Amino acid sequence: LRWRARAQPSAVLDNLVARIRAWWVMAGVVGIAFVFGRAGVIGLFALVSLFALREFITLTPTRRGDYYALLAAFYIVLPWQYGLVWTGWYGMYTLLIPVHAFLVLPILATIGGDTTRYLERTAKVQWGLMICVFCISHVPALLNLEIPGYAGRNLLLIAFLVIVVQSSDVLQYVWGKLAGRHLIAPKLSPSKTVEGFIGGVLSASLL
């Protein structure tokens, strides 16, 4: 596409090429993790959770009173969650964050003695853990599934998930540019359209 349009620079084409290149970079990183097996995959997604949570907290206003809650989130809950995934303790890693951490973090937040926007601040840390750690940790947790006749090949489930998700992202962009008319959430994502979303989901489902 770039070769055919070399005489006519296009921001849309440049964006698409950038997305595809990012796709290959991510595919390469996941591939390297696969070489190291279970340890590599769990370690990779633990790092992804760490960077995602760090970015989330950076974009979320916090106060000095949140120090102990954030300390627990980064240095206790996150590594504990992935440690449980490593050991395959399903009953614990499915409850650690949505139950135990949700109860303990508000208590830790009170130690700082700061009551300003207390509930809002606590909720942000809680849901940061849910999105960035709990949800992401369930990708390597696929390694713990025991599927009859599929023993030793659980890495393929993660590979399939990554391929479908990345393909959906690229295809949503393509469909959005080809047939996009109605924006989903203009203030949140100016380029996401209803048509692109539907086209991307349906196309990825065919995979």
Question: Which ranges hold each PLM region?
Answer:
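Membrane-embedded alpha-helical bundles of polytopic integral membrane proteins
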Residues: L1-L207
